[in-house]
Amino acid sequence: MASLIYRQLLTNSYTVELSDEIQEIGSTKTQDVTVNPGPFAQTNYAPVNWGPGETNDSTTVEPVLDGPYQPTTFNPPVSYWMLLAPTNAGVVVEGTNNTNRWLATILIEPNVQQVERTYTLFGQQVQVTVSNNSQTKWKFVDLSKQTQDGNYSQHGSLLSTPKLYGVMKHGGKIYTYNGETPNATTDYYSTTNFDTVNMTAYCDFYIIPLAQEAKCTKYINNGLPPIQNTRNIVPVSIVSRNIVYTRAQPNQDIVVSKTSLWKEMQYNRDIVIRFKFANSIIKSGGLGYKWSEVSFKPANYQYTYTRDGEEVTAHTTCSVNGINNFNYNGGSLPTDFVISKYEVIKENSFVYIDYWDDSQAFRNMVNVRSLAADLNSVMCTGGDYSFALPLGHYPVMTGGAVSLHSAGVTLSTQFTDFVSLNSLRFRFRLSVEEPPFSILRTRVSGLYGLPAARPNNSQEYYEIAGRFSLISLVPSNDDYQTPIINSVTVRQDLERQLGELRDEFNNLSQQIAMSQLIDLALLPLDMFSMFSGIKSTIDAAKSMATNVMKRFKKSSLANSVSTLTDSLSDAASSISRNASVRSVSSTASAWTEVSNITSDINVTTSSISTQTSTISRRLRLKEMATQTDGMNFDDISAAVLKTKIDKSTQLNTNTLPEIVTEASEKFIPNRAYRVIKDDEVLEASTDGKYFAYKVETFEEIPFDVQKFADLVTDSPVISAIIDFKTLKNLNDNYGISRQQALNLLRSDPRVLREFINQDNPIIRNRIESLIMQCRL
């Protein structure tokens, strides 16, 4: 039978070389996450950013934490936070525009009763009444006046454990922090000529750009990173910030060495990376309340931008690795909301962005050394996605955020629709950010990460500015170009190829002749005969079979076999421990997984439907293990697969393993299985439908789920190629003998061929419907 190919793949797919395993582990990483919501389900993350520090050769990348600097008087740049780190009580900072705003901040130690103290503010002795009732936290207080001879008033106190304070000039205002750590927030004072306000810092301080305000707030609330609190960190003068040094231009080509035929060129480029995520949201069959998958997909994006007066055309491909698989199950009823799998990227994930532009740097990117890059970080936030239910309020997946931080660069190759491009792959590590994501109107809430439902949040693209530098060996004659070959890391976008191949496979279903299909389904297809139609040589067929086996090892069918083997082992050990007791939980459960529910005889109709559906999903494996003379669904699916492989014009060695594995999982999703006991037939399908009837008259009788579970264990399981409704329709319209009925019930291929050769419309329609279910 044609289903021999699946049994061979299951048998042989576990022999894999160690080098292949290592390569696969390095290229693919998926993590299943089980979430148990509770008061301690989520925790905050430490505000530590272990980075390389400032890189002075970039015109676009600036450090997150610049400093520390020594106490001084200067005019801070606009839109930059001064993060002040005092060590003792007293005046921390003061600033004025010399017209209508004099603002100073003082620090008061813990546990200070109301007392009058003298402070020197703007060169004058001032008496101020202060207090701090906190036993552990230090208190920052703003002192402000609007005229030179006016009196100071106190504003915006901040109770702080880390003993850090922030001041910034921005948008006609002076911003500070108030409240109590770890929940301090920003506040502001309006002022004129804000850009001319000079600041005098009486303690060490850092400078943080406004774009990194979230980091500044984390430092205020939680303290500086541990590396900043060591004796190796020495404050320097603020004038060091103004040291003039030579920076590379946005576009720079430098000849490193040159011979008659070859030369080494160093390319320095400022780049703007724009990218977006793509996703796939797949709805399951049924009543419309269930989704099978919400996943990330590779996304291509082409754009133009201006670099040093030159318009640059760029192309990016964004992909993700280290996916976390979540799921939500609202219940077992057909109208309960279910998401079988939705993907989330978190701190254990990586984002890869392959970048190419039309500059000279990418013309000869084959032999490359000294590759380096530095990029800014970017925040990616999730939007709202509504799951449209037929009735009731829509569940909405909302929120979620991650920030991307540069973690390295390698060479790669992008495969677009028209051309292959040697490019750079920028790797980004992730950290989770606020807000968390949730699914409204469900129990899912307060989870961190970026889900795949709407990762772009209505934005056309995300943008990162940065710079890269590399040295490339190129021909001395600039008119020559080295050919494009696979670089260090090859990124082949199989999604596009597989999408086109799936469409071709689905269209080929209409070109299959049923009589030939039945003959092909009866042939013992092995791996060589299955794949030999693609390549003529034996070695090529062997290589393809090996690749298919490697991929097939990870299929859901192979995983089901592994699970079943464990169940049978448990059942065997249970029986050996107590041979005198025949337990449904130790025998039938290995095939049916209904050990806990078959004991209740008074079950409802919906409960029986659930049980029979659960049993039917496992009967494919039982049928494989106890092969009969009848034809089964896998014979038909394998024959259809063989026919389509022979007819396909787009199949290759890269896509074949994916297609064969998908076919084993997705061909003929709606299957029915039957067991025969004397003159009774019990039949159940994977969609929960069940029938019990007599062979002689096709008269329906009550369905006994306990009897069905027992027969499944002890009797052969038969694929209902011609299901009960088709049989009853055939008998009512044409009339069939008892022997013909038994042969059709046993899925006898000879009888099937006879009906097809007689052009029986009922049988032909049934076989055609099975062929049309062979879709990817």
UniProtKB/Swiss-Prot annotation:
GO terms for cellular component: host cell endoplasmic reticulum-Golgi intermediate compartment; host cell plasma membrane; host cell rough endoplasmic reticulum; host cytoskeleton; membrane; viral outer capsid. One of its GO terms (biological process) is virion attachment to host cell. It comes from the Viruses. Residues 65-224 are annotated as: Spike head. In group A rotaviruses, VP4 defines the P serotype. Pfam families: Rota_VP4_MID, VP4_haemagglut, VP4_helical. A motif (KID motif) lies at residues 644-646. Residues 510-776 are annotated as: Spike foot. Keywords: Capsid protein, Coiled coil, Disulfide bond, Hemagglutinin, Host cell membrane, Host cytoplasm, Host cytoskeleton, Host endoplasmic reticulum, Host membrane, Host-virus interaction, Membrane, Outer capsid protein, Viral attachment to host cell, Viral penetration into host cytoplasm, Viral penetration via permeabilization of host membrane, Virion, Virus entry into host cell. Residues 248-479 are annotated as: Spike body and stalk (antigen domain). Signal peptide: none annotated. Gene3D superfamilies: 1.20.5.170, 2.60.120.200. It comes from Rotavirus A (strain RVA/Cow/France/RF/1975/G6P6[1]). Residues 484-518 form a coiled coil. This is Outer capsid protein VP4. Belongs to the rotavirus VP4 family. The record marks 231-232, 241-242, 247-248 as: Cleavage. Residues 389-409 are annotated as: Hydrophobic. A motif (YGL motif) lies at residues 448-450. Disulfide bonds join 203-216, 318-380. The record marks 101, 190 as: Binding to sialic acid. HAMAP family: Rota_A_VP4, Rota_VP4. A motif (DGE motif) lies at residues 308-310.
